[in-house]
UniProtKB/Swiss-Prot annotation:
This is Protein P18. GO terms for cellular component: membrane; viral inner membrane; virion membrane. The lineage of its organism: Viruses, Varidnaviria, Bamfordvirae, Preplasmiviricota, Tectiliviricetes. Component of the phage injection machinery. Required for DNA injection in the membrane transformation event. Involved in the formation of the membrane tail tube to connect the virus interior with the host cytosol. Essential for viral infectivity. It is found in: Virion membrane. One of its GO terms (biological process) is symbiont entry into host cell. Keywords: Capsid inner membrane protein, Membrane, Transmembrane, Transmembrane helix, Viral genome ejection through host cell envelope, Viral penetration into host cytoplasm, Virion, Virus entry into host cell. The chain crosses the membrane at residues 1-21, 37-57, 60-80. The keyword Membrane applies. The keyword Membrane applies. It is a multi-pass membrane protein.
């Protein structure tokens, strides 16, 4: 989780340095507006990220995080076909 926050901070710092924060936020708004239920997925990932810092439940939380990633990949129709097309180079 700290790594993710550092990456987000670096992205925001670069956008601020280039004076493109408005453009960055409009892109994020467009992406999140088109994806139904996007907020729920982000909230689930954040909760799992924080829960992973609790040592006794770290392994089950990691399993749920992997499951969340798999569901996000498969949820989008044609995602597997797009990935295979990209790997084939066509």
């Amino acid at each position: 989780m700290p790594f993710g926050l550092i990456v987000i901070g670096i992205i925001l710092a670069i956008a601020a340095y280039r004076d493109t924060l408005g453009e960055l936020f409009s892109i994020i708004k467009d992406v999140s507006k088109d994806a139904k239920g996007f907020g729920y997925w982000v909230l689930a990932a954040v909760i799992l990220g924080f829960a992973a810092s609790i040592k006794p439940i770290k392994e089950p939380v990691n399993a749920f995080m992997i499951l969340l990633m798999i569901v996000l990949l498969i949820r989008k129709r044609g995602a597997i076909d797009q990935i295979s097309n990209q790997l084939r180079g066509s």
